[in-house]
Design a protein with these regions (language model features):
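Cysteine-dependent hydrolase recognition
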Residues: 1-262
């Protein structure tokens, strides 16, 4: 890690490649909030939206499951900053919920999967099944459990979200990643998502994460335009962090100042 930090400081790196992602359930999935963030970023980082720079916005509904696409974007060389808005746990980035769809079969399968998740592993499955049938008015057949269904549900859960074991030996290449999520920055634990990004084989050297629950009614990208002015990431963090927010990695890293006259 220290070797790649020293190497990064020797570079003259512009903030000219930005990646932004939104997971399910974030800001109540309001399209107005998602659109408003894009407008705010354009105002703060105008050079990023001109010819020669790259900005990518990905919503959880862009793909299902989103996980392979997110990991592929994070592995791309040249990404300077990645902003990730989603729910989280110390060892998980929650990306997708159940598949959206207007078809009856999609809806029924989602309901069955939900019911199985409430019964499977319960200390009294039969009692729990009866409660769910009475509460939701669903057929008993929809609450069926089997080894094959348990395996299929487990594989789907694994495929929908980024788990910490997905990051072992996988390069995460954005220089800086912001995890606007609960618990991803739980540095007090033996492992957490934010630490796995910087200690992997990729180019990531600093992450911002939250050690406990994170607020959603906030402006997480506030003052981020300062990073294009050569301000160090730690100095930016001093002005925007809440009690639960932390930088993990090198707070002294900065991009070159593109706001200088000429």
């Amino acid at each position: 890690y220290l070797r790649k930090v020293v190497k990064a400081h020797a570079e003259q790196n512009e903030l000219d490649n930005l990646f932004v992602f939104r997971g399910h359930g974030y800001n109540s999935e309001a399209p107005e909030a998602w659109a408003g963030e894009q407008i705010a970023l354009r105002e703060q980082l105008p050079a990023l939206f001109r010819t020669g720079s790259t900005v990518r916005f990905y919503d959880f509904e862009s793909r299902w499951p989103m996980k392979p696409y997110l990991l592929e974007k994070m592995a791309r060389k040249g990404v300077d900053v990645a902003l990730c808005h989603h729910h989280g746990a110390p060892d998980t980035q929650y990306l997708n919920g159940y598949r959206n769809g207007s078809g009856m079969n999609v809806s029924i399968e989602n309901i069955k999967r939900f019911l199985r998740s409430k019964i499977d592993g319960h200390k009294d499955p039969e009692k729990r099944k009866a409660e769910l049938i009475a509460y939701y008015g669903v057929p008993e057949a929809w609450c069926q459990l089997s080894d094959s269904l348990h395996t299929a549900d487990s594989l789907l859960d694994q495929a929908m979200d980024v788990h910490i074991e997905d990051l072992y030996n996988r390069p995460m290449n954005p220089r800086m990643v912001m995890f606007d999520a609960c618990y991803n920055g739980s540095f007090h634990l033996d492992e957490c998502i934010a630490a796995s990004y910087i200690f992997g084989p990729g180019d990531c050297i600093v992450t911002q994460g939250n050690s406990v629950n994170a607020l959603q009614d906030k402006w997480p990208d506030r003052y981020i335009g300062l990073l294009d002015c050569g301000v160090r990431i730690g100095q930016w963090g001093r002005h925007v962090h809440y009690l639960e927010t932390h930088l993990i990695g090198d707070p002294t890293y900065r991009f070159i100042n593109r706001a200088l006259p000429g």
